[in-house]
Amino acid sequence: MTPIRKLDDSRSNGARVADVRKRYLEFFEKRGHAVIPSAPIVPENDPTTLFTSSGMQPLVPYLLGEPHPEGTRLADSQMSFRAEDIEEVGDNRHTTFFEMLGNWSLGDYFKQEQLPWFFDYMTSTEEGLGLNPEHLYVTVFAGDEESGMAADSESVEIWKKLFGDKGIEAKFVELGTEERGNELGMQGGRIFSYGAKKNWWSRAGVPAKMPAGEIGGPDSEVFYDFGLPHDPKFGKECHPNCDCGRFIEIGNSVFMQYQKQEDSSFKELPKRNVDFGGGLERLAAAVRGDADIFMIDVFDAARAVLEERSGKQYGDADATRSFRIILDHMRAASFFISSGIRPGNSEQGYVLRRLIRRSIREADKLGIKDAVLAEVAEGFGAAYADAYPFVQAAAETIREELEKEEVQFRKTLVHGMKELEKMGGAIDAFMLFTTYGFPVELTEEIAKERGIALDMSAVQEKMETHKNLSREGAAQKFAGGLADHAEQTVRYHTAHHLLLKALQVVLGPDVHQRGSNITSERLRIDFSYGQKMTDEQKREVERIVNEKIAEAIPVVRTDMKKEEAEKLGAEHEFGATYPETVSVYSVGPLDSAFSIEFCGGPHVANTSELGEGGKHFKILKEEASSAGIRRIKAVLE
């Protein structure tokens, strides 16, 4: 392969993730973009999705037309987590936690600016990454016969010119489907077109599945060719969308330009948007010229711990997959715990527990029998100190939680073994996994040791069904989260603001929100308080909230400088960072407001709407959530 330029770095083996992130944000800032902070890894006030899973997710209201306080050009690096990818981790490119570099045009620029800018960022030696354009391949939308959507010929012409300016002839090849690509291969192409399954974006999927009113559009992806030999088990021929590992997607520009009509036709949006997402870790790997994401610098310290404790080297055939799973899972766990998530049996806590338990099993495979996860996780604090200092600040908590969970899971393994013994020759590996968290691989090994024939195909079928249901649930949650601005949910969101202030009035000013979950059926708030509330305190909180509902107070949104909002004492989300200009919602005018919070909305226009139909605010339950944290569930009825 042609050597590629490395970024300035004290390490000899490639660019640091911090360099790639910094250059990206500076590049787009120079082009008029406001750099906004990453949203929290757990979405605020959104019960329909467990995690922030893309850079676009926190910005959906603005892509749908709501004005953003920072303007029409935005850029960021967003912390993201995809639980559905847990089982995929182990190859050279899949991770659960990752950072998504993003830039957005909210009705501002479009294809003619976006594609040249990203190409320049990738290839420029002055402002960008200095990637060799010979290693870049792109895909575009081939059109969709079912919906009548035309092919994206405009992007094809833009890409031809960009490569041509670098002295590269960019042959266009129409593949249409991944299967066709597996049959025909590259054919000397540089630009490839695929159908709606690969190169169209909408929340509902392909054009035919989009409901009336839904927006969407074609996208154009960029792949980096690492020059690895093609693995024929992924198809006869290789092409950009092949999964053999030779090509890795490093960026995707989505052009939101259409809205579906009642008659199933599409019309151009009056304001077209650009939504770009680029994998930070994958871009860093491309700069290094090494397809293995787990060799980038943020994993160095953790990888060294595993090598020392196991006596094995990363790259050893029998160790690499276990290394990768532990490295990925402990990075995610570090961000989870430092964001306030604790191991548990539901929602985010369950996912964290699953990550930890899988890591313990993989450590066992490496021959590490003593506690090691806390030591592995320790290196991530320093690795992300520049962008996410809260991880390093929570080092002691991360260590304590991982050590505690590791001890607990060792006990779980003991319980699982007892149940396995009771089963005799009729071992139910799926039940052991779902009930006790007992790893299927461990059950399989013990069955082999005892000469028991375990029908692993049936087990894997059940596991695959279980995994698909989880993925479908995650997809439904994500889709629902984008659209759930239902009237009653909005009312509960406003009631949540009233409740938090009422708690501060009754329990003291040190009470602050530590989590929330709002649906159209009820609201839930986690808040800092060290003891159980008395019945009298709960009644007083209810009285205050209902009093503010009866007072028919206007709810006002104001965009202002962050410093001004802080001076006003506006409540803000625990652990979150905010841009220089923020939106605040106040119950009442700012100079005499009952409550003021940093918030993106939506809310009712007046508190009286919460009492429509004679409804009153009522606390259903007050209970402990975790140490020093209480939880209230409440309704309007």
Protein language model features and the residues they cover:
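A glycine- and charged-residue-rich anion-binding loop/surface
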Residues: 1-637
